[in-house]
A protein has these predicted regions:
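Conserved N-terminal/central alpha/beta ligand/cofactor-binding core
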Residues: 1-175
């Protein structure tokens, strides 16, 4: 809650809303109040530190709601984040050490394993307006990436979701 990416989009959130929501979804007495307070106060600082001192960058997920958005303090979106996509070839040979994304977070068809972001996934899997154009763009870019196909087989150089997060952490360690 209250991270820099949501604030950049002028999202209405507060520490009290976050506290109310956490308390509404947690079994009473199972999480110490001091841990909740630490999460609320220090979580945004951790995100700021990573943003300012590493290659770890996120994007706000405006349409990804809390699990129970109707609970006290719940929100219809803007609390979740995902790592910014990154070109995996920046990892050099370490790209080969990175596991494929989970099949539920990529378009998998035979040997093809094409990555997408959560926002793209919502559009594609929901067959929302524009999904065909997006799919054609992603698929064409993926298939025509001949250097990648020749060196790494069907691995997608465009890393998203967890793989993007891991890649950004690895690159930060190398800096």
């Amino acid at each position: 809650p209250n991270n820099r990416y949501a604030k950049a989009e002028n999202v209405d959130d507060s520490d009290q809303d976050a506290r109310d929501y956490i308390n509404s979804v947690s079994p009473k007495g199972k999480i110490k109040d001091e841990l909740i307070e630490t999460y609320i106060s220090e979580g945004p600082k951790m995100i700021d530190y990573l943003h300012d001192n590493s290659q770890v960058k996120y994007r706000n997920l405006a349409h990804y709601p809390d699990y129970f958005p109707d609970n006290p303090g719940g929100k219809e979106g803007n609390r979740s984040m995902e790592p910014e996509p990154i070109n995996g070839t920046q990892l050099g040979n370490d790209l080969g050490k990175l596991r494929e994304q989970h099949p539920q977070t990529a378009f998998t068809m035979g040997p093809i394993n094409m990555n997408f972001t959560q926002v793209e996934g919502q559009l594609l899997l929901g067959a929302l307006p524009g999904w065909k154009t997006l799919f054609a763009k992603l698929f064409t870019k993926y298939i025509l990436d001949l250097p990648m196909r020749l060196k790494w087989g069907w691995k997608d150089r465009r890393l998203t979701m967890g793989n993007a997060g891991v890649a950004r952490l690895v690159l930060s360690l190398k800096d």
